[in-house]
Amino acid sequence: MTGIRIAAMLGIAAFLLAALPHAAFAWTPGTHVFLGDAVLHSTQLLPSAIADLLRAFPYDFLYGSIAADTSIAKKYAAVGRHCHSWDVGFDIHEAATDEPLRAFALGYLAHLAADSVAHNYFVPMQLTVTSSTSSIGHSYWESRFETHLGERYSRQAHDLILLDHAMSDLLLDGILSPTLFSTHTNRRLFRGMV
């Protein structure tokens, strides 16, 4: 997939976030599934090759959209090699050897795009207008929106992680740096929290 197509996908994700600004106040697994679902329902806006890929492998795309959060204590990963690094996201995309893995990688990149908007615009704005401390306020604003979504998307995130994602997990295991825990242990902990 060319850089232009990746840029188009990220541009569409940013467009959807701008079109749905009320959704950008929280980036929990349920919210990432909500945003990923919005992309899947807007495939007519995507280049046809990407749209066809996401329609063929929606669960791989959605799993990618939450997989970047599977690492616990990412600050203990090697510099520039933590799960939310764009270099890591692009490494995952480049290493994707088949269509399901490419859909997964695009979901992973969509997750990073959504977090970039949240962490660089929406959360700081909310911290400013509410006089919250960054340590408490950040988590508060990241989790607040999911309460407005109801249980549908958090339940969908939970059901999603129970599916077989062995190939995607194997890809992550080869790229992600361990934190305090191995990537396998991080994933087990994450699945227990969703």
Say what each PLM segment does.
Residues 11-108, 112-180, 188:
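N-terminal, motif-rich segments that launch catalysis or mediate targeting to/interaction with membranes
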